Amino acid sequence: MVKKRLKKFLAIVLVFCLAGMFYYVQKPIVLTIGIFAGSNWNVPSPKSGKIIDDAIKRFEKTHPNVQVKYVSGILKDDYSDWISKEALDGKLPDVFMVLSDDLSTYAKVGMLEPLDTYMQMDADFDQRRYFSTTLNAGNIYDHQYALPYESSPTLMFVNKTLLEENDIGIPNINWTWDDFYSICEKLTVDTDGDGEIDQFGEYGYTWQNALSSNGQALYDEKTMKSTLSNNDVYSAIEFVRKLNRLNRNQNVTSEMFDKGKVAFCPMMFSEYRTYKPYPWSVKKYSNFEWDCLPMPAGPDGYNVSQMDSLLCGISKMSSKKKMAWEFLKLLCYDETTQESLFKYSQGVSVLKNVTTSKNVTKYIQEDAPMDASYNLDFFDDMMERAITVKKIDGYDQ
């Protein structure tokens, strides 16, 4: 009798153990990600969330026991505070987007897992597929703390109509500061004879723009020392002062450029992608023809510009780092995901074989009016030479 009861008890225990094991095996693994709604580039982007949602579906299909979850509806302006609060509460997502301004802080306080070992040990990962500039955006303090997800370089927008009306040709892609100044000087005039300048050469061109195109950055990333005492930096500042003197204390505004009264204006490529194609072209800059060029080169630099990148990293406190790395690669290294940036976002892919000059032109041409044509042959070279935007210990690069 005792033996029967013992056997029955052991059988019940075995059933519960097997049930527990089955539940443990079948229990879904939840991978959390941190994202924000809308565009990183502050332009209309109603479909940008589709890129992440599609990537999640593909990941869950190849990982049947995994669920990828995120909190929706967080705005970009609130995102940094939200991530910081999640970190303080011990609930930092396994994988999360990192704004370029936040990389230094997150790396310094230990929120981000260094990725150097993952990149070196993963036989399927080849960092040469990235533009060196885009990959460098996630590198700080001699470690790779994030991978680039999406980038947007700054270009020089040019009012073609204004130049043509004044018998001035569009500069070539190798134009210089001297070319830039010469055109601005010719176009900065009083057109109606009321004694006040009402047409201008440029709006928004800063000494930081000049600094990048003169072969300098605000600080040396290797020595972590400021470069402000260098002669090239001084030349950049003096050049912008010289440009500003043309305006004779007149305050040039973005509204003036929008109305076609200004020839040149630096803008991010994301704005070019948003406002060049129809229907957004009807809503902005509709009274003149415009296009973009690389930045004018300084005497000691090249036709390069600053480039901002949206990054993505792995939480240092994550218990699922191996799986997080796989999902990170799906966002930042997978060609399908990266190509979808051209369809549903306004930035460009961080991968060389996706963001070719030919591809960039093709995607813009598809959305543009039938009679429009664009020449972006300079894009590859510009991406590879760009100066990455970073903030280290409170200083912008």
Where do the protein language model's features map onto the residues?
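Glycine-centered hinge/linker elements that transmit conformational signals in sensory
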Residues: 183-184, 222-251, 295
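Extracytoplasmic/periplasmic substrate-recognition and gating elements
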Residues: 35, 67, 245, 282-353
